[in-house]
Regions:
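Bacterial Sec-dependent N-terminal signal peptides
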Residues: 1-26
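Carbohydrate-interacting/catalytic domains
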Residues: 2, 6, 21, 101-103, ...
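Beta-strand/beta-sandwich contexts
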Residues: 22-53, 105, 109-114, 118
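Immunoglobulin-like IPT/TIG beta-sandwich domains and homologous Ig-like subdomains
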Residues: 37-100
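Conserved, mostly hydrophobic/aromatic
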Residues: 131, 176, 186, 207, ...
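Substrate-binding/active-site clefts of carbohydrate-active enzymes
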Residues: 136-182, 186-338, 343, 362-371, ...
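Active-site-proximal helices and loops of the catalytic beta/alpha 8
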Residues: 224, 242, 251, 336-338, ...
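Active-site clefts of carbohydrate-active enzymes
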Residues: 447-470
C-alpha cells in the first residue's frame, strides 16, 4: 500500500542529499516519439537518482542535442532535441556521463502512421456521448488490485469504484451504434493512484499510463480503433490545471515553481497524510485554495489578490495546482497531449477546469496542437454562467487581450437554464421557451457559435431528469432542441433510457451504473427487451433523431432563423443549400388551437407539405393550426 510509495519517496530524498550516490536513469518522458512532426523540437524529461548533473550526448543521424535544462532537484534532467527532417525511424543512442561512469539508453523514434493535416476532429456534425468508464460496464478483464493504494470495488457506495473497464465499453459499441451517436467522450482514463480509488479520474498520477483498473494503454488504443471502425470518434478528457497529490512529482518536485502556491516538502507530506487519514491538519489549512470565482479571469477591475486565488489556488487539497508558467512543465504537458493523439488516434480533447490554468500558456498549447493537427478539436470546460463570459474564452474574441486559440467552449448557460426552459409555462418574454430564444439572441457574442458544446447535464451537474418521469413530452421537447439547434450536442450516458438523479447528497448519485453493464444486474437497458415501455419510447425517439442527424448539413452547418414564442409556440428553421427543416414546439401544458400561421410565411406557407422526422407522417401547413400540449414537431 503506502509502503511502496514512501519507500520511493525516501530513495528520491536520499538521492537529493547524497552527493556520491550512483547516477541512474529510471524513466524518460515521452516514452517514444515520431519522425516527421511539424514541430521538430522534442523535450525529454529524464528521471533518475542524481541524473541532473550528468553530461548527456546523442548519437543518431538527423537528431541533435540542442540544450540541457537542470532545475532544482538533482533527480531530473530536461533534454531538448531537434528531430530533423532527415531523421529516420529507429533508435536514438543517448549517453549520460557521470564521472567515469556512463549510462547508455536507447530512445525510440517511430514513423508516423498518417498525415497530421488529415487527422479528423469532432465538430457540429457529431453528437458526443459522455460516459464514465467506471460506471458504464465491466468487461471482466481487469485484475483490479493493481495499485499502490488499497481500494474496494463497492457498487453499493456511490463514491467508491464500481469496476467499469475499457473492455466493458468495447463490449457495448453495438449499443452506441444502434443509438446513433458519432463520438464518445470518456472521463479521464489515465492513472489515478489515490486513496479511496479516485474512480472519477481527475487526479492524474501518471500522464503516460492508462489506469490499470480500466485496462492498459494497448486496451485504450484498441478501443479507439474499434470505435473508428464503426464511425465513432473518441474524445479524451485531460487536466493541465492540476495533478493528483500522490503523483511521483509530489515526492520530489523538479523545481521550486513546479506548483502554484507550492508548499515545502514537509508541508506536502503533511497534506498527503491528511488526505490519507481524512483528518485535516495545519498544512491543509495553510494551503491556498481556489475561490472558484472564474469571472476574475475577465473582470477589468479585478484585484491581483482575487485573481491569484482563482488561478493559482489548488482546486482541492488532493489536487496540487500545476504552474503552467513554468516553460519546462508546459512543454511536458503539450507534448503529452500530442503523444496521445499520435499514439492512440483520439479525435478531440476535452480540457478540464480550463480557465483555472494560465491563459497564455494554454493558448500556446492550443497553437501547438493545431500546428500538428489542423482539423483536430479541443473543447475547454469553462464553467461560467453567462454568454459573454463563455464567449471571452473562445479564440477570436475581440474583447480578450489574449487570443486563447481555444476552438470550442461549453454552453454552460444553456445547461443552467434547461430545466426551467422546458419546465416552465411559456408565457412572458422571459420564461419557458423564451429562455432559449433569448439565449440564442446573444450568439452575436461568439466568434463561432457552431463551436459551442451544447448540453443539459454531465457528471458534475444534476441530471436533466431529477426523478423518473411519467410522461415524455417535455423530455422529448428538450432532446429535440438539443439535437437540432446550433452547436455540438453532448448527451450524458443513460439519458436515452431516462436515467435521473440529483447531486444534492453526493456527485455519485448522478454517476450511477448503467443498468446491465455489470455482473449480477437484474435488468439490462442495452437491449430493447430490458427497457421499460417508457424507456423504449425514449430510446427510439432519440435514436431516430440521431440517425436522421448523421450527414445532415442542415443540422451541422445550416443557418438558423427563429421566431420569438410570443404566442407560446417556438418555431425555427435550419437551412443549408437545398436541405432544410423546421422545428415547432408548444411551450405550455395546454393545447394551442387556431394558431395563425401567417407570421411564419418567411419559412412556410399554407399548402407546403413536410415529413415529420419522428413519425414519418406527412404534415401540410394550414392557415391556422392546432398543437397538442408540449407538442414537438421536426418537419423536413
Amino acid at each position: 500500500m503506502m509502503k511502496k510509495i514512501f519507500l520511493v519517496a525516501g530513495l528520491l530524498l536520499a538521492g537529493a542529499m547524497t552527493t556520491n550516490a550512483k547516477t541512474a536513469v529510471d524513466r524518460m518522458d515521452p516514452p517514444m516519439w515520431w519522425t516527421g512532426m511539424e514541430n521538430q523540437q522534442l523535450q525529454i524529461m529524464v528521471t533518475g537518482e542524481g541524473i541532473r548533473d550528468a553530461v548527456p550526448s546523442v548519437d543518431c543521424p538527423g537528431v541533435k542535442l540542442d540544450s540541457v535544462a537542470r532545475l532544482d532537484s538533482p533527480n531530473y534532467q530536461f533534454l531538448y532535441l531537434t528531430i530533423g527532417s532527415d531523421a529516420k525511424p529507429g533508435t536514438v543512442d543517448i549517453t549520460f556521463a557521470s564521472g567515469k561512469r556512463k549510462i547508455k539508453k536507447q530512445y525510440e523514434l517511430l514513423a508516423r502512421q498518417g498525415d497530421g493535416a488529415s487527422h479528423e476532429g469532432f465538430d457540429s456534425s457529431d453528437v458526443l456521448y459522455l460516459m464514465m468508464p467506471d460506471r458504464f460496464a465491466d468487461g471482466g478483464d481487469v485484475k483490479h488490485q493493481s495499485t499502490n493504494f488499497d481500494y474496494r470495488i463497492d457498487r453499493t457506495n456511490p463514491g467508491a469504484r464500481h469496476g467499469g473497464t475499457l473492455k466493458g465499453i468495447s463490449d457495448h459499441l453495438d449499443y452506441l451504434e444502434e443509438l446513433g451517436v458519432t463520438a464518445v467522450w470518456l472521463t479521464p482514463v489515465l492513472e489515478n493512484d489515490m486513496p479511496g480509488g479516485c474512480y472519477h479520474g481527475y487526479a492524474t498520477t501518471d500522464y503516460y499510463r492508462v489506469d490499470p483498473r480500466f485496462g492498459s494503454n494497448d486496451d485504450y488504443r484498441r478501443l479507439i480503433s474499434e470505435c473508428h471502425s464503426r464511425g465513432i470518434k473518441v474524445v479524451m478528457d485531460m487536466i493541465f490545471n492540476h495533478c493528483g497529490l500522490y503523483h511521483p512529482w509530489l515526492y520530489d518536485l523538479p523545481s521550486h515553481d513546479w506548483l502554484n502556491a507550492q508548499p515545502t516538502a514537509d508541508g506536502i507530506r503533511s497534506v498527503q497524510q491528511a488526505n490519507l487519514t481524512g483528518k485535516r491538519n495545519a498544512a491543509v489549512d495553510s494551503l491556498l485554495l481556489t475561490n472558484f470565482r472564474l469571472n476574475t479571469v475577465h473582470d477589468p477591475y479585478v484585484s491581483q489578490y482575487d485573481f491569484n486565488h482563482t488561478v493559482d489556488g489548488w482546486f482541492v487539497s488532493g489536487m496540487p495546482d500545476l504552474n503552467q508558467r513554468n516553460p519546462h512543465l508546459m512543454t511536458y504537458l503539450i507534448q503529452n497531449s500530442i503523444w496521445w493523439i499520435e499514439y492512440a488516434g483520439i479525435n478531440g480533447i476535452r480540457m478540464d477546469t480550463y480557465p483555472y490554468a494560465d491563459m497564455e500558456a494554454m493558448a500556446r498549447w492550443n497553437r501547438a496542437v493545431a500546428r500538428e493537427y489542423p482539423r483536430f478539436n479541443i473543447v475547454g470546460e469553462s464553467w461560467l454562467e453567462n454568454e459573454a463570459s463563455i464567449a471571452y474564452m473562445q479564440r477570436g474574441n475581440k474583447l480578450n487581450p489574449v487570443n486563447t486559440e481555444l476552438p470550442t467552449v461549453m454552453d454552460f448557460p444553456l445547461c443552467l437554464m434547461a430545466q426551467q426552459a422546458f419546465g416552465e409555462q411559456t408565457k412572458s418574454g422571459s420564461d419557458g421557451l423564451n429562455r432559449l430564444f433569448n439565449h440564442l439572441a446573444l450568439d452575436m457574442l461568439y466568434a463561432d457559435c457552431s463551436r459551442l458544446l451544447t448540453f443539459y447535464d454531465n457528471h458534475d451537474t444534476d441530471r436533466f431528469l431529477l426523478e423518473e418521469p411519467s410522461d415524455l413530452a417535455r423530455w422529448k421537447q428538450a432532446q429535440a432542441f438539443l439535437l437540432t439547434t446550433r452547436g455540438i450536442p453532448q448527451i450524458y450516458y443513460g439519458t436515452e433510457v431516462l436515467m435521473h438523479g440529483s447531486k444534492a447528497v453526493t456527485d455519485g448519485y448522478v454517476r450511477l451504473d448503467m443498468p446491465g453493464g455489470f455482473p449480477g444486474d437484474s435488468v439490462s437497458v442495452f437491449t430493447a427487451d430490458g427497457r421499460t415501455p417508457l424507456q423504449r419510447d425514449a430510446f427510439n425517439f432519440m435514436s431516430r433523431l440521431l440517425h436522421w442527424r448523421q450527414g445532415n448539413k442542415a443540422v451541422s452547418a445550416g443557418t438558423l432563423r427563429h421566431f420569438m414564442p410570443s404566442n407560446q409556440l417556438y418555431v425555427y428553421e435550419r437551412t443549408n443549400g437545398d436541405r432544410r427543416f423546421i422545428v415547432l414546439m408548444n411551450g405550455t401544458d395546454e393545447p394551442l388551437t387556431d394558431v395563425d400561421m401567417s407570421r411564419y410565411v418567411e419559412i412556410m406557407r399554407p399548402g407546403d407539405t413536410f415529413r415529420d422526422v419522428i413519425t414519418g407522417d406527412a404534415v401540410t401547413v394550414a392557415p391556422h393550426m392546432s398543437f397538442p400540449a408540449r407538442a414537438t414537431l421536426v418537419l423536413e
